[in-house]
Amino acid sequence: MVNVMNTLSFASLSFNSNNTPVSEQFDDIYFSTQDGLEESYYVFQDGNQLWQKWQTHDVESFVIAETGFGTGLNFLAVADKFQQFLSEFPNSKLKRLYFISFEKFPLTSEQLATIHKNYPQFATLSQKMTACWQPRQTGCQRYHFEQIYLDVWFGDMLDNLPQLGDLYTNRIDAWFLDGFSPDKNPEMWNETLYRQMFSLTKNGGSFATFTAASTVRKGLQAVGFEVKKRKGFGKKREMLWGEKPQQSETAPVNYPYFYSESQTEANDIAVVGGGVASLFVVLSLLEKGKKVTLYCKDNALAQNASGNLQGAIYPQLSDDDERNIRFYVHCFDYALQRLSQIEPLVEFEHALTGVALYAYNDKTAKKLEKIARQTNDDSLFKLCSAAELSEKIGLKVPNGGAFMPQSGWLSPIQFVQGTFAYLQTKGLQIVLNHEVKDPQFSEGKWHWQHNGKTFSHQILVLANGHTLTQFQQAQGIPLYPVRGQVSQIPTTPALQQLKCVVCYDGYLTPVSKANTHCIGASHVRDKAETYFSLEEHHENVAKLQQNLTACDWTQGIDESQNLAKQGVRAALRDRVPMVGQMPNFSVQKVQYQNLYNQLRRKQAVENAANFANLYMVNGLASRGLTTAPLLGEMLASLICDEPLPISEDIWHVLSPNRTWIRKLLKGSKVE
């Protein structure tokens, strides 16, 4: 069994006589004993001439990459400086800073907070960062601080750098070549790093580093950088800095069949939806400065699957594909961060008091044991005995299972409607009772007719669940509807003691403010009707009583009120969503009919044929509360041509054309 999440090791930290943090792994200091902050300003900010570059930058985002996050001091210093820049130059074209950093041995949030106490000028940003800092697995974790985005790639940098992939080529404006010194950490300072750096750097992009080692200078020159020397910081005689020549050739696309286009010049975006998937696309697009209009076919928002009174939020950890597990854990951590940001702004019922996974039969028990072998993070998932699980649940259960302490529930309908209302105060336009039909692209815009009027937008995003297949552009997307009915029951004296969500072959939520619980949910594939089903209502309650058969607290349930919410989920057979540019299926199946042989013969392959300015996010199924925040951020980043917070291997798993590309890569025919 592959343990997909235990490859991350934390730093062994000590402090020297100057109270400077020291890595015991590398036997090296994290920053100068003279003045770590001044060293950061001098070496990296001045070395890359950031203040001057920001004033003349001609796009809305600036991307810095750093080779060792360490204490986060470089990030805090440059973030603080960027906030000063925005204050001093409010009309600048540049609006957002992306700071991409790599860290093999992360410090804990407690260690970071201790070190940051020496820099009270950064206290606010440090507190925000350490509050959500939880290195859990290898790969990218995005953190938001208004106009500043921090992406930390945990794990070995030489493994992570290639995972930045095609969408990062020619993307990085400046490098902070930090990390421990070349003689202490020779594994990092090598040709592989320099070659990847050169590919990822924009023409004219720069780097700066504290070292002047000849091996580093020659290595950077060998891959194409122009390398120069300047006075080193403090007692150091010299340091290196340099640039990528303006006339450098762009690196070829490695995966042209998964290629997507961005639209940096387009500002006017229409989003079709009304549920949680569209909500987070809209949120991220607004944060990136776009003008957004939401079109919803219903007379109110959150009328479909996002309209439940209570819904669980937790990651899907059961999967044979470790990329899927990594995706869901990334999503979960990002969702928790987003919820903490929205919580002060919007009123919605929620309680992150945990989710109990009940082992109602031997098969489920073995499945939970398998998951436990894939993670050593008890804050995410922990096996429990019957006594332990009973204590977590608040009611006695005869079997054990597992507990996910950071998970919980929220009210989707309150959350979605409340957050959309908040976003209207930030410029979002919402149009209800408007079904977008038969959109056509011409002269750089998408157009459609509604009630005798023409509506036009530069970009169209389809985040409309199972109705996606009504658009002819979605031909070939193997989406199918799943009808679900969630039952609502009045509480009982026993059920009022329920502390957390309980999952079995269904789920039961704790009591809401309305003194009700939700029991869910039926699963009827290929059905899109939303009528009340008495049979499904009875089945929901029966599942609870049958799965927790020895629990007398399940027996006194009153189901006579026949209260339930029906919704239709959009699902995909491989159980992960789709996000990206809309692929043109009819063209791609011809374009790539000989893909297997082209790759085998190392022949050139065209970039994928997609519909211009048309994007989608779909297939969230029953995991929308967990996955929608990161999916929305990914899609907005793609549209805006800004760094994606996900590794390339997972991005390919989420690609809208993945089902037929997989077949074509094997030499199979696609009809």
Curated annotation (Swiss-Prot):
Its cofactor is FAD. One of its GO terms (cellular component) is cytoplasm. It catalyses: 5-aminomethyl-2-thiouridine(34) in tRNA + S-adenosyl-L-methionine = 5-methylaminomethyl-2-thiouridine(34) in tRNA + S-adenosyl-L-homocysteine + H(+). It comes from the Bacteria. Pfam families: DAO (PF01266), Methyltransf_30 (PF05430). It is found in: Cytoplasm. GO terms for molecular function: flavin adenine dinucleotide binding; oxidoreductase activity, acting on the CH-NH group of donors; tRNA (5-methylaminomethyl-2-thiouridylate)(34)-methyltransferase activity. Signal peptide: none annotated. InterPro entries: FAD-dep_OxRdtase, FAD/NAD-bd_sf, MnmC-like_methylTransf, SAM-dependent_MTases_sf, tRNA_MAMT_biosynth_bifunc_MnmC, tRNA_MNMC2, tRNA_S-uridine_synth_MnmC_C. Its EC number is 2.1.1.61, 1.5.-.-. Keywords: Cytoplasm, FAD, Flavoprotein, Methyltransferase, Multifunctional enzyme, Oxidoreductase, S-adenosyl-L-methionine, Transferase, tRNA processing. Residues 1-245 are annotated as: tRNA (mnm(5)s(2)U34)-methyltransferase. The keyword Translocase does not apply. PANTHER family: SARCOSINE DEHYDROGENASE-RELATED, TRNA 5-METHYLAMINOMETHYL-2-THIOURIDINE BIOSYNTHESIS BIFUNCTIONAL PROTEIN MNMC. In the N-terminal section; belongs to the methyltransferase superfamily. tRNA (mnm(5)s(2)U34)-methyltransferase family. In the C-terminal section; belongs to the DAO family. This is tRNA 5-methylaminomethyl-2-thiouridine biosynthesis bifunctional protein MnmC. It comes from Actinobacillus pleuropneumoniae serotype 3 (strain JL03). The lineage of its organism: Bacteria, Pseudomonadati, Pseudomonadota, Gammaproteobacteria, Pasteurellales.
